[in-house]
């Protein structure tokens, strides 16, 4: 894990007894953070924003948690999972403080979104760490995914010129966007996440062959829904994102 290289201590906000630095100095180094509470892990990324320059990543951290395993089988987050997540986020908060992070965005996706005790969980996160976590829906996930790859798409003329299918496979869902000349015209979120499908397969009774048939039928039904909503056959190129996609590649 990397540590701050150019800090003697945590940054502080100006007080009545200290003068604020010039605007140019303030803009030259602005550490910000994003936190992602996913189905199988919680992740932190800290970057430094400099006016007119691309973000410089300072720190990345990830901790495995079982939010999806709990939410997708029992519908609620278990005590052990909540405690493990709190410990991870508490550690992330200390890392953020060491960089002097003031601005951040923390989001939770399908696992927390579907848990019946999500409000209790979010309250505990706020009390324990001081972090305010925002539960986002599928449309916001798609928007953030597109925003993240938009600049990269512009560097590939073939992807911008034609029709491209953008797919992000997460633990709880798969987010699909159909891009025409680099702009999204269709998008949707579907229950095809790796953790969700694995938990569903384990919960079904019967022989291995019977469970495989049920699994395939379930996937086929979801794919039919996707085809009704998104013109898959028109896509000339495909772009897959996410840890599971990288593993398959």
Give short role names for the model-derived ranges.
Residues 1-37, 45-169, 177-249:
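Nucleotide/phosphate-binding catalytic cleft detector across ATP-hydrolyzing
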Residues 40:
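Primarily the dimerization/phosphotransfer
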